[in-house]
Amino acid sequence: MATLQAIKYSRGKLLVLDQLRLPHEHHYDEVSTAEQAFDCIRSMRVRGAPAIAIVAALAHAVELHNGDCTATTPEDTIAYIESRLDYLKDSRPTAVDLSNAIALLKQAARAATVEGLAHPEAKEAILNAYIAAAETILAKDLDNNTSIGTHGAAWLQQQYHATPSRPLSVLTHCNTGSLATSGHGTALGIIRSLHQQQLLKHAYCTETRPYNQGSRLTAFELVFEGIPATLVTDSMAAALFALHRERMNIGAVVVGADRVVRNGDTANKIGTYALAVLARHHGVKFVVAAPTTSIDLETESGAGIEIEERKPEELTQVTGAVVNADGSVDASRTARVAIADQRIGVWNPAFDVTPHDLIDAIVTERGAVVKGADGRFDFSQVLPERWRW
């Protein structure tokens, strides 16, 4: 079955699906400069930690391929690349995939510097190395997501002895599918894998206020792929667990991550922490799905994570397609409406931090990580190349 694509890329051209227009309109923006990528990311036309990193990396690759770098020496070429990447790094501060990708891309450009080459050849080698590294980030993300889905489905199957005759139901939050990645998704990828193996009874997705990524995007993906699913508001999760956990065999809350730090504390879309508390109270497993690029071993705990705050209007206003008097949706017309007194004070953090003690497993492309006897997550098995005491 065809899946949605948030990112379409060929060398020299990048198209990014404008997710603010979903689910009623499919429109791709051409992104050919760092400035356009910054605006695309900042305005949340593209979102999801992996997708943000991919768009930033590829937008600069398009710039370089199309000749925007006028530097003549290797040193100036690298300085130009690094300045553009530093600019893109500020587009959204909480997701660690972006900063990890930028570090990798800088390293690739520096490593391409070859002694003895004339300046034009040296510059070309640096540009080619950057473009190849950016394209590798795109290709690896899809492979990683498929592996996350496989490992996550296997872990849940083992926990609950799920079978096609006794499948699991799960709840997910925000959007972590093809629209947040290069394809398949992280947490939603686990749901896809369960569904493909006939181990999924039902998926529940939260509305995910205030930006409604669950109702606008995840619900759209689930319907698009024919996965049995129900949309609930964020505040219905407790009632869902209390009233339907046993009948629907609700076994897990599966979420993505914008940043997982060394002790396992996880920054994710606002509302994730509340779901973790509810899951623990009701005996439901709480699972984080994230590629190893989302793991930040330099930050010891969630206290060190910078939490982005968004503008008040995202909480007090909504935009959507116009509903006609007969109940039909006119996708050609949109309207922005106020849903609160515009004079009210607003606190609008984009993310919260779920403490590691509320998390049962962190599923990566290299396997599921669970806490040891000391109650701590140990990422040394999935990140031996980056782990150090």
UniProtKB/Swiss-Prot annotation:
<dbReference type="GO" id="GO:0046523">
    <property type="term" value="F:S-methyl-5-thioribose-1-phosphate isomerase activity"/>
</dbReference>
<comment type="pathway">
    <text>Amino-acid biosynthesis; L-methionine biosynthesis via salvage pathway; L-methionine from S-methyl-5-thio-alpha-D-ribose 1-phosphate: step 1/6.</text>
</comment>
<feature type="site" description="Transition state stabilizer">
    <location>
        <position position="174"/>
    </location>
</feature>
<feature type="active site" description="Proton donor">
    <location>
        <position position="258"/>
    </location>
</feature>
<comment type="similarity">
    <text>Belongs to the eIF-2B alpha/beta/delta subunits family. MtnA subfamily.</text>
</comment>
<dbReference type="InterPro" id="IPR011559">
    <property type="entry name" value="Initiation_fac_2B_a/b/d"/>
</dbReference>
<dbReference type="GO" id="GO:0005737">
    <property type="term" value="C:cytoplasm"/>
</dbReference>
<dbReference type="InterPro" id="IPR000649">
    <property type="entry name" value="IF-2B-related"/>
</dbReference>
<dbReference type="Pfam" id="PF01008">
    <property type="entry name" value="IF-2B"/>
</dbReference>
<dbReference type="GO" id="GO:0005634">
    <property type="term" value="C:nucleus"/>
</dbReference>
<dbReference type="InterPro" id="IPR005251">
    <property type="entry name" value="IF-M1Pi"/>
</dbReference>
<dbReference type="GO" id="GO:0019509">
    <property type="term" value="P:L-methionine salvage from methylthioadenosine"/>
</dbReference>
<protein>
    <recommendedName>
        <fullName>Methylthioribose-1-phosphate isomerase</fullName>
        <ecNumber>5.3.1.23</ecNumber>
    </recommendedName>
</protein>
<keyword id="KW-0028">Amino-acid biosynthesis</keyword>
<keyword id="KW-0963">Cytoplasm</keyword>
<keyword id="KW-0539">Nucleus</keyword>
<dbReference type="InterPro" id="IPR037171">
    <property type="entry name" value="NagB/RpiA_transferase-like"/>
</dbReference>
<dbReference type="InterPro" id="IPR042529">
    <property type="entry name" value="IF_2B-like_C"/>
</dbReference>
<keyword id="KW-0486">Methionine biosynthesis</keyword>
<keyword id="KW-0413">Isomerase</keyword>
<dbReference type="InterPro" id="IPR027363">
    <property type="entry name" value="M1Pi_N"/>
</dbReference>
<comment type="function">
    <text>Catalyzes the interconversion of methylthioribose-1-phosphate (MTR-1-P) into methylthioribulose-1-phosphate (MTRu-1-P).</text>
</comment>
